[in-house]
Amino acid sequence: IDTNSIEEKISKRTALILPVHFGGYPAELDKIAKICKKNKLNLVEDAAHAVGTRFKNKMIGTHGDAVCFSFHPVKNLAMPAGGVITLNRNMKKFEKELKERRWCGISNRNFFEYDVNQIGWNYYMNEFSAAIGIVQLAKLEKLNHKRKNIAKRYFHELKSENKMPFDNFCSYHLYWIRVKNRTKFIKNMLEKKIEVGIHY
């Protein structure tokens, strides 16, 4: 997210700013938080790539009003499926709505009696995914350290002006680079048995 162009895009309909920590590299949260405060907007982070990343010595997931994490087998916190939304301040109305939407819009559940106040879906995470996630949490720091070492090597050895910066506090879910001849670059990397993807 380009922090220099956020304010010009804010309209009467804007309710929040949602930065994505792409590849695990943290967005400029201090600047974004100031813009949110000035314009009375919520800050909701997409931290799907950034489990274990730090920004200004604080873990990603502790800065925004709300933070979204989604899980996948190839992400830093490797799990079959699922996601989490965390709230960092008292947002009773939003919390109530999230709880209602997580399971078919059901609220006020009391044994066999309940209300369905709104449309919802089945967002419950299955126990299998949750169990794997708990085990993966214990390995997260070690795995992120390996990713950092690989990213450091890419940063020093890949000859391109337009590549992901190196930051000791980044979790490096992905390492992005832009090159003039993508096909040739991919071919060279695959010859060295380095998997390359085209993302977003």
Residue ranges and their predicted role:
Residues 1-79, 84-92:
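Active-site phosphate-binding strand-loop segment of PLP-dependent enzymes
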Residues 2-4, 8, 16-20, 25, ...:
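PLP-dependent aminotransferase class I/II
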